[in-house]
């Protein structure tokens, strides 16, 4: 375009610069989006496109329960400690309840406790790079690893784990003496696979884990431990599990998600599932199929439409 005077040229140049500045400011403000610790605000956060397009993921259960590696068909072997200590058993089948206890006593002796498996969990054959290569060749888009299951044993150097249980209770201090989560994350980051971290809410034998002391459990253990995991490994996905029969107020879910979405180092990229409390299924980006079934039964029991 030709201009008849310098004034026109200057005006056009200024307009271009103003547009550029406006775009930069807009982008900056988008990056500064924060979410208040309230569902009205948290619910406005969209599901990130990477997860909507990731149709195939791989879920890995791996921990101390991998040492005995046994439970009757139709039951969860990762619940070995619970079955052992409570002498009960739930699942698909007819059980007396003492199957795991009887097996454990026969294999390891009556005085051998679940904690005695910790020195045996050495992960000698673990090669995270081999895992990543296998997952990539399988066509997976994201992976989820159990960084901590319901017995509280952590696969990274979590000081909260050992402090709460009064003994070495993470893979750096006992057993493998390795940061298993760190190796997993580093291997996946060499590929385009998304990093998922399973994080258990419940901890069967944590001294603070009961309804009367949930505030202390949250402040002293749960929240600082979650922050440690997120700050150190910056996962793309947090898979929460095990809220038991406690709601979002007890678990302080709004506070947790507000931090994840607004302050954490992954605030613009993190995806979460729907198991942060017993009533958060319809507030999250991911709704797990078995949770949908529970919600449908609840809706029908109230005489409402399945389509809310």
Located regions from the model:
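Positively charged n-region of N-terminal signal peptides that target proteins for export
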Residues: 4-5, 11-18, 135
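Sec-dependent N-terminal signal peptides
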Residues: 17-27
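Intrinsic disorder/low-complexity segments
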Residues: 2-5, 23-25
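Sec/Tat signal peptide C-region and signal peptidase I cleavage site
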Residues: 12, 27-31
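Intrinsic-disorder/low-complexity regions
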Residues: 5-6, 273
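Alpha-helical and His/Cys-centered functional microenvironments
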Residues: 11, 21, 65
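Mature catalytic domains of secreted/periplasmic carbohydrate-active enzymes
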Residues: 32-308
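Short, small-residue-biased leader/transition segments that mark boundaries at the very start
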Residues: 1-2, 31
């Amino acid at each position: 375009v030709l201009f008849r005077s310098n004034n026109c040229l200057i005006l056009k140049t200024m307009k271009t610069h103003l547009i550029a500045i406006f775009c930069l400011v807009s982008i900056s403000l988008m990056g500064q989006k924060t979410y208040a610790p309230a569902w009205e605000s948290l619910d406005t956060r969209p599901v990130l496109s990477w997860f909507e397009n990731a149709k195939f993921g791989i879920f890995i259960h791996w921990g101390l329960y991998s040492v005995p590696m046994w439970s009757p068909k139709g039951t969860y072997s990762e619940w070995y400690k619970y079955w052992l200590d409570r002498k009960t058993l739930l699942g698909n089948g007819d059980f007396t309840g003492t199957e795991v206890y009887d097996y454990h006593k026969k294999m390891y002796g009556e005085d051998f406790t679940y904690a005695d498996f910790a020195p045996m969990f050495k992960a000698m054959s673990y090669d995270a790079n081999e895992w990543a290569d296998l997952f990539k060749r399988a066509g997976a888009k994201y992976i989820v690893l159990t960084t901590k299951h319901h017995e509280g044993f952590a696969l990274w150097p979590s000081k909260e784990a050992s402090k709460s249980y009064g003994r070495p209770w993470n893979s750096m201090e006992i057993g493998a003496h390795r940061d298993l989560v760190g190796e997993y994350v580093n291997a996946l980051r060499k590929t385009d696979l998304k990093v998922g971290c399973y994080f258990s809410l419940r901890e069967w034998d944590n001294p603070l884990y009961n309804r009367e002391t949930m505030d202390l459990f949250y402040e002293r253990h749960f929240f600082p431990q979650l922050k440690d995991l997120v700050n150190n490994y910056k996962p793309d996905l947090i898979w929460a599990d095990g809220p038991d029969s406690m709601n979002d107020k007890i678990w302080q879910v709004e506070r947790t998600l507000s931090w994840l979405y607004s302050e954490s180092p992954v605030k613009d990229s993190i995806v979460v599932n729907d198991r942060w409390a017993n009533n958060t299924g319809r507030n999250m980006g991911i709704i797990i199929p078995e949770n949908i079934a529970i919600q449908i039964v609840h809706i029908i029991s109230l005489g409402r439409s399945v389509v809310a």
